[in-house]
Structures are given as C-alpha cells and as structure tokens.
C-alpha cells in the first residue's frame, strides 16, 4: 500500500515515542490511506487518498 496521499502529499512522519519512565524509542506515524476509485481529469482512476481528504470532499468518487 502506498504511504503517501496523492491529493495533499501527506506522508509518513518519524519521531520519538516516550514511555512512562521516559525511555525513548524511534517510531513512525503513517497517515490513514485508502485505495479509492475517483474521477481524475474526467476518467475514473484508482488513487491512494488519506481519509482527511475523503471526508473534506477533495476527491470526487467514481461510482
């Protein structure tokens, strides 16, 4: 599965997670990406889109 939204280019972010005792471990946070059939330039196409773009209506879904 793709790890980047094709609409807003939201991708994986790296950082540090802290435990209760304040020990650090590196980890990544990935966006919630869905594979959706959408209308792109008048034709239906399968694109990888984050759920934020789906909810906000930035993607016109193909039926």
UniProtKB/Swiss-Prot annotation:
Keywords: Ribonucleoprotein, Ribosomal protein. Belongs to the bacterial ribosomal protein bL28 family. It comes from the Bacteria. One of its GO terms (cellular component) is ribosome. Pfam families: Ribosomal_L28. This is Large ribosomal subunit protein bL28. The gene is rpmB. GO terms for biological process: translation. The keyword Ribosomal protein applies. The lineage of its organism: Bacteria, Bacillati, Bacillota, Clostridia, Eubacteriales. One of its GO terms (molecular function) is structural constituent of ribosome.
